Curated annotation (Swiss-Prot):
The protein's assembly and partners: Monomer.
Classification via PANTHER family: S-ADENOSYLMETHIONINE:TRNA RIBOSYLTRANSFERASE-ISOMERASE (PTHR30307:SF0)
EC number: 2.4.99.17
SUPFAM superfamilies referenced in this protein's UniProt entry, alphabetically: QueA-like
Keyword Transferase (UniProt): yes
Known pathway: tRNA modification; tRNA-queuosine biosynthesis
Protein's name in the database: S-adenosylmethionine:tRNA ribosyltransferase-isomerase
Compartments where found: Cytoplasm
Annotated NCBIfam families: PRK01424.1 (NF002398)
Organism: Rickettsia prowazekii (strain Madrid E)
Length: 383
């Protein structure tokens, strides 16, 4: 199939810039011969006793760092505890060997890769990478969320030459400096002073996230509240968790007209023995398995061999296209996706090409909100 087959017209006004007032107050579209539009908190009515909801428990890290001079990097893939691949903007301003200081901690540019990508090495002073990012980083909101940046002292850089350093009377104790190959010095402050009126640190994170590693949220889970999870448990709906650390590559466009020529990025996955056993048991009993998000679906189907889900840690680059043989997942809860994206292609494979185009046409007519902070839809596997 051609990439253009998966195109549709999406009004920019439908791209959600902020989360709903409450997590479960977003809209939910139930796919079917007659679509049902309701509120997310009513999802309980569409699940049965004995069904299994599988969640991705990966936690978003504060992967966005300001390097001064209007340069930012977004960590993308962990190579080791101290080495990462990152997307830089603009990468042309960075050179191999550039050093960036945050208080007593240092980041070194070690390699320039494909367009926009770099390798960085962290040299941290008695602090873990996660604690470093918690102090100096920001939640990496997707590029399509375009709104005024929160007030952040790390954006207020003081630039000067080392040989002609300006004397500042009152510099906060947590100011830091950046040294680059062209001998510029930039002083930065950590993000302790962020004024975040939209509370992205909370709302761009699922309430059940546990394992740090994602640089983008598994957004289908953002709608769940403790109250909903408690009601599902009372009804007899079971839950299980897998881990897939979402990479920034999830936002990369498909650039080949022949979709089968597209190469997916790899992402780390993990399925515990307990989760594998409950998935297999549910399947054997003939009950429904509902994947909360495309990341969960991709993890489960990647780990399946002859209808049996295997436990373990692995990387997946699975690209699900029409004709894919789904062995495990019966239903998919997901947000609304980009036209011509790997995720829209995935849901067409799962729930039907014509059906998904019709569903999205209906969603657009109903002015449902799209993408990370948008509304959700519950899809049934086409058989």
């Amino acid at each position: 199939m051609k990439l253009s087959d998966f195109d549709f017209n999406l009004p920019s006004a439908l791209i959600a810039q902020y989360p709903s007032s409450e997590r479960d107050n977003s809209d939910l579209l139930i796919a079917g011969t007659k679509h049902i539009k309701t509120k997310f908190y009513n999802i309980i009515d569409y699940l049965k006793k004995g069904d299994l909801l599988v969640f991705n428990n990966s936690k978003v890290i504060k992967a966005k760092l300001h390097l001064g001079k209007n340069i930012t990097i977004n960590l993308n893939k962990k190579l080791s505890d101290n080495c990462w691949i990152a997307f830089a903007k603009p990468a042309r301003k960075l050179n191999i060997g550039d050093e960036f200081y945050f208080d007593t901690h240092k980041i070194i540019i070690t390699e320039k890769l494909a367009i926009g990508e770099i390798k960085v090495k962290f040299m941290l002073d008695n602090i873990s990478i996660i604690k470093f990012l918690d102090k100096y980083g920001e939640i990496p909101l997707p590029f399509y969320i375009k709104r005024p940046s929160p007030v952040c002292y790390s954006n207020m850089a003081l630039c000067c030459k080392p040989e002609n350093t300006l004397k500042i009377k009152s510099i906060p104790h947590n100011m830091s400096k950046i040294v680059t190959n062209n001998s510029n010095t930039v002083n930065l402050r950590s993000n302790d002073g962020i004024i975040d009126s939209t509370n992205d640190n909370d709302r761009y994170q699922t309430i059940y996230s546990q394992i740090e590693g994602s640089v983008a949220a598994p957004t289908a889970g953002l709608h769940f509240t403790k109250n909903i999870l408690d009601k599902l448990k009372t009804k007899g709906v079971h839950t299980a968790f897998v881990t897939l650390h979402v990479g920034a590559g999830t936002f990369l466009p498909v650039k080949t007209e022949n979709i089968h020529e597209h190469k997916m990025h790899t992402e780390y996955c993990s399925i515990t023995t307990e989760t594998a056993e409950i998935i297999n048991k549910t399947k054997q009993e003939g009950r429904s398995i509902i994947a909360v998000g495309t990341t969960t679906l991709r993890t489960i189907e990647s780990a399946c061999n002859n209808g049996i889900v295997r436990a373990g840690n692995f990387e997946t680059d699975i690209f699900i296209t029409p004709g894919f043989n789904f062995q495990v997942v019966d239903m998919l809860l997901t947000n609304f996706h980009f036209p011509k994206s790997t995720l829209f292609i995935l849901i067409c494979a799962f729930a039907g090409f014509k059906e998904m185009h019709a569903l999205y046409k209906y969603a657009i007519k109903e002015k449902m909100r799209f993408f990370s902070y948008g509304d959700a839809t519950l899809l049934y596997r086409k058989v």
